[in-house]
Amino acid sequence: MEALIASTSFFVPISNSSSSHIINNRFFPSFYSPNLNFGTFRKTSLSSSHLVFSSSAISAPPSSTVLTRNSYWMVLLDKPPHWVSSKSAMVDYYVEILAKVLGNEKDAQVSIYDASFDTHFGFCCHIDEDASRQLASLPGVVSIRPEQDYSSEKKNYGIGSHKGVSLFDHGTVKHWMVRIDKPGVGIVTKAQMVDHCVQLLSKVLWNEKDAQMCLYHVSWQSDFGFCCDLDERSAVELAGVPGVLAVVPDNSFESLNKDYEGDSTQDSRDQDDSESPPVKTKKLFITGLSFYTSEKTLRAAFEGFGELVEVKIIMDKISKRSKGYAFLEYTTEEAAGTALKEMNGKIINGWMIVVDVAKTKPFRQNRSQPSFGL
């Protein structure tokens, strides 16, 4: 099921003269539409808010250009910071985001050919698949998806309110049932199983948020698997992901009782998480954190369950930014067990976190001792 939200676009006419440009007052007319189509653009020497339109609006790639699969992409973003208010400032903001992947603003300016400023925030760009993967991992990027009809004047930036969003070409999406291997011992709750399935699916979709939106069912206690909306090409790719046993059509899409093992026995996947056996631990491992969540915020969220010995968010040594996961340690196992049960799947700074038992490091004494094996 797809949710399509139509939105109008303002298409800038193409001049036949290679030297003619459209200056700022025409680039952003008073009757502007939330979406703006443009070709390559650059800043003039007048000011950073004055943009110049080049005469090469995207309509079809040159015959000499060899395009890789999926070269045109639609990028959806979180709402820009409040100080990015004007339309020209938003374009600069979009360019800065893309420049983090391409390496410089000039290439980013040339690659962007459409932008949306109002209800939905984002842009369309012409980049290769490797760059699209890097772009999908940047903070503030909600999703990135191929845009097949890149020459269309009307762009649909809406992601909808349903899980079956328009990540794929219209009419190509099908419902699939995915059977997977039994997860590791650390996955003991439904929220952890959801996170595990998202990780598998994101190997195909490249973006965890897109993977979350495509999921619509998870089985996690007896039969292991999930159901999702994909096109056939993505389904074939998913079947080759390690840990995936089979990808078959979901012939019982309307039913909540899914037959992951080929029989019709009633499973117990809807039992309460509290029936899971208690885990003895003082240390917890938190994943799914927003890159902007601080140790102070994390401590405030967890200290209500007991005294904390340590709160440590793991930082990237190069970028000095959070990697999105952290470790917590309580003074008692009871406090840690309660926090594990109550906080798993909760929302912190707009992101759903997954709380797990912190695993000890593997025993590696044999590296420093002689081997007595045959």
Swiss-Prot record:
Residues 258-271 have a biased composition (Basic and acidic residues). Keywords: Chloroplast, mRNA processing, Plastid, RNA-binding, Transit peptide. Residues 1-54 form a transit peptide. The keyword Cell cycle does not apply. Disruption phenotype: No visible phenotype under normal growth conditions, but mutant plants exhibit severe editing defects in chloroplastic transcripts. SUPFAM superfamilies: RNA-binding domain, RBD (SSF54928). GO terms for molecular function: mRNA binding; RNA binding. It is found in: Plastid, Chloroplast. The keyword tRNA-binding does not apply. InterPro entries: MORF/ORRM1/DAG-like (IPR039206), MORF/ORRM1/DAG-like_MORF (IPR054059), Nucleotide-bd_a/b_plait_sf (IPR012677), RBD_domain_sf (IPR035979), RRM_dom (IPR000504), S8pro/Inhibitor_I9_sf (IPR037045). One of its GO terms (biological process) is cytidine to uridine editing. It holds the Pfam family MORF_dom. Residues 258-279 are annotated as: Disordered. Its main location: plastid. It comes from the Eukaryota. Residues 282-360 form the RRM domain. GO terms for cellular component: chloroplast. Involved in C-to-U editing of chloroplastic RNA. Functions as major chloroplastic editing factor. Controls 62 percent of the chloroplastic editing sites. Binds RNA close to ORRM1-dependent editing sites in vitro. Binds the editing recognition trans-factors PCMP-H51/CRR28 and PCMP-H12/OTP82. Interacts with PCMP-H51/CRR28 and PCMP-H12/OTP82. Interacts with MORF8/RIP1, MORF2/RIP2 and VAR3/OZ1. This is Organelle RRM domain-containing protein 1, chloroplastic. The gene is ORRM1.
